[in-house]
């Protein structure tokens, strides 16, 4: 879910074409959740193949990632590894929320309620099969992926800070806490999107957030930004009741990088806050990775999607033509640029 900084951070809208020839380290789990939540049937059920296996994420990867490649973007997907021990309670709580949402979805669906779609989205979860299938399809498409030693966003942030990528691609703001210099949002959902439960549509454009701009605007150090996030709530702690971003900002402005003083004023405690802060500042990351794009393998993609997962042959043929053309054009441009 990520930390809630939306009310304090002002992203800068860009056009997708501005990411041409830019490497984006995509938070894989975050993006898969988007695909699984958004790409659904009218009753809220995810897309599935003839055997009942969920395929919404595969649809998102083949069609929407192809859109990004056509714009000249160079995505590299970064998957989560082993989460830190203090994330266990969050993982457990989320599983309980999703199970409750699943039960409400089934009840709403049986009753023919319009609320079914909302509950279906809230029940979205990722299992090992979904992750494995995503990696297979990305590999066949020639899109590189990395498995982080711990949190994918931390690894992606590290890659951008080291110059191996230009942006972290994620809907969450956590990448900023991990030190990502630049984050781009909405790359996977750009275009017209229906407003939930309303018969209206809105334009969704990519948004860029730069860490130094955020710190300068808020008048904080990165350490203080992390303290503020911990007060509001992160992936590793629930935050303090009734302390939102604005209240947290005031407290950090008053006390600076002094969490004990803030907690003393509030009369509250936050379990593991020191370990959480240390993890944001010094997460487990690795230099043992390669970022290399390959050529798509149309025959393997077609077999995987059409024969194994019941995709339409005609639709897959069309998107494969687009993908191979886009990769070919990118290769030509790279070859030409080497002459100058």
UniProtKB/Swiss-Prot annotation:
Chain residues that bind Mg(2+) 1: 27, 80, 151, 153
MF (Gene Ontology): 5'-3' exonuclease activity; 5'-flap endonuclease activity; DNA binding; magnesium ion binding
Positions of region (N-domain): 1-98
Gene Ontology biological process terms from the UniProt entry: DNA repair; DNA replication, removal of RNA primer
Disulfide bonds, paired cysteine numbers: none
Assembly and binders: Interacts with PCNA. PCNA stimulates the nuclease activity without altering cleavage specificity.
Protein's UniProt name: Flap endonuclease 1
Lineage, uppermost ranks: Archaea, Methanobacteriati, Methanobacteriota, Stenosarchaea group, Methanomicrobia
Gene (name only): fen
